[in-house]
C-alpha cells in the first residue's frame, strides 16, 4: 500500500534516510544522520538542483559557476544549468603509462578558484574515462574548496560505498563542506530513478524545499525496494561480491579484445579504474572522433565521440577530437563484435593518412 498510497516527505522516506545514514556510518565512518540525507528522483535531478543552487545568478547580482577541475567529464552535466556559461573547466595532465595506457590527473599547477566559483564538482569514478581520482587528489580538492568557502560535489553514481564499480584503491570521503551524490541505478534499479544526496543540513533543507516545489515529494518506489537490501545488510554485499567482480571480469575481456583489435596503431586506453567504460585515445587520428563516430554508426556500432565530454573552452586542443567512449556493459558477443569493427575503422582512418 505504501508504494502508491502515500506521499513521503519532501526530503524523502524517513526510514530509508535513517538506514542510509546508518550504512554510511558503519561502512565509511561518516558522522551523518537522517537529516544529512535527501532523496531525489535520480542523480540527474540531484545535480540539476545542486548546480542551480550554487551557480547562476545570485541575490548579490553575481554570476557564479561550477568549476570542473578535470575534464573530460560527464556529458549530462553540461545542460543542467538554467543559465549559459555555467561551467569553468580545466585540462588534465596526461601521464603515459607504458606503450598503450595513460591516465588523466588534476593539474593543480594551473587550477585556480576565482571569486565567481560557486562549487567544485568531480565524478569518482568518472564517466566517460573510468578514471578514479586518487585519495591525494581528492583531499587536495577538498582543502581547496574549504579555503575558498565553496562546497566540493562528488558524483558517486558508480562509486563508493555502493555500487562500488571501483577497481583501484580509493577511500570514500565526506565532510560538512562536501556533498556526495549516490544512486540506486547501478545496483540494478535504474528505472526507479532514486538519487541520494549526502550533505550538511543547510543543503539538504534546500533540496527538501526544491522537491516540495517541483514534485511535492520524491518517489517512494526506489527507497521501499532498496529498504529490503538495507534491512538484510545485503546492499554492500551485493556491490562487493556481485556487481564489482562482474564488471571487473567484463573489463578484462574488453581490454584484451581492444588490444588485439588495435595492435599496430598508435592507440592508448585510459587505465580503467572504475565504471563500465573504456576511453580510447587515438593520437594523431587523421579524421575527427565525430567522423569516426559516424562511420561506426553506419556499421551499427555505437560509441560516443570524446569531443562531447570536453566543454568548448574557446581554445583549440586536438586531444578533444581524438577520443572515443566505449561501453562494455552489453552482451560479451556484442562487445567483441563492436570492438572488432572499431579496430577495422581505426585502421582504415590511419591508412587514409598513410600512418
Question: What are these regions, as identified by a protein language model?
Answer:
Residues 2-148, 153-175, 179, 350-355:
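Conserved core of the PLP fold type I
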Residues 286-292, 333-337:
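Short, conserved charged micro-motifs
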Residues 14-18, 22, 26, 31, ...:
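PLP-dependent enzyme catalytic core of the Aspartate aminotransferase-like
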